[in-house]
Amino acid sequence: MIDKSFWQGKRVFITGHTGFKGGWLSLWLSEMGATLKGYSLDAPTSPSLFDTASISSLMESEIGDIRDFEKLRNSIASFKPEIIFHMAAQPLVRLSYKEPIETYSTNVMGTVHLLEAVKQVGGIKAVVNITSDKCYENREWVWGYRENEAMGGYDPYSNSKGCAELVASAFRSSFFNPRDYANHGVGLASVRAGNVIGGGDWAEDRLIPDILRSFENNQQVVIRNPHSIRPWQHVLEPLSGYIVVAQNLYTDGAKYSEGWNFGPREEDAKTVEFIVDKMVTLWGEGASWLLDGQNHPHEAHYLKLDCSKAHMQLGWHPRWALVETLGRIVKWHKAWINGSDMLEYSKREIHDYMTTTTFS
């Protein structure tokens, strides 16, 4: 499990630190005493977690494009990190239909650039490559996908994440092979999570942010696909897994250099309709929703992960049930509306998670 003392003084480089997941990861690692540098485009939304929780006060922050190889390599070389989390991405399915070139250049070539920089700079012990559960070839069957399933992806976003996994696999085989770990000393793992939700997400075309925007403006929530099932989980759930993977890569890179799934309990893979109904109840007065009957680009209807390997080999398990998570999201958002100090509020959220010892 997470070892807070391990992170004290560790030099950690994070791409995509201005994003939703990147902001939460930066805050968590800072709380454990890590020395951080982030490399990313400006925060993708306004407002954003990065700004509302003052994440920039916790770390060195460089604004740069993952597609600019020279700038990225120089940024890494000047910081001399021990551990890298690669989160920078174009993360939206529907945007990938409109901007496929940007999606592939960011998600695929961005990964190539990051791993080539690691190879050239040297001195890095652990690289955690964050992709997505959508990297798998989705057969829309009832079983969870295991780490050795085929990569795929129907839409440009999902396919780009499958490609990013293949890039990581090729670099691992060619340059960071576990069998040759004694010579190169680099542990490289890929981590895959489902639909991550939590306070501080204002992205377009995501269910929870769309719901909260509508509630905040006293508008009905318009739902596209009420029967779609997603593996919903609080953002701290997979991040805790990524952190544990990094710890293990650092101490035994050869053993843990592979793919890892991080998803919720099976009973928390719920429909969109379940989510919006719960959110309506939690928000209270004035909240409601309606069905949008228009045609929309294809989105997979069912995809879940088999996380048995993470359970058995990492001791990782989810801590917060979906209903607990939804309640925390509403409270976080209302605290922001009411002008609370969201850095301190978010620190307390992490503390609550760290001190949850049984599933709640």
Regions found by a protein language model. Give the residues of each.
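Glycine-/small-residue-rich active-site loops that bind phosphorylated ligands and cofactors
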Residues: 67, 92, 103, 198, ...
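N-terminal Rossmann-like NAD(P)+-binding domain of SDR-like oxidoreductases, especially those catalyzing
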Residues: 1-193, 349-354
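C-terminal structured domain segments across diverse proteins
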Residues: 149, 188, 209, 213-223
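Residue-level recognition of oxygen-bearing side chains
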Residues: 71, 102, 109, 207, ...
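C-terminal substrate-binding subdomain of Rossmann-fold SDR/epimerase-dehydratase oxidoreductases
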Residues: 31-38, 64, 195, 215-360
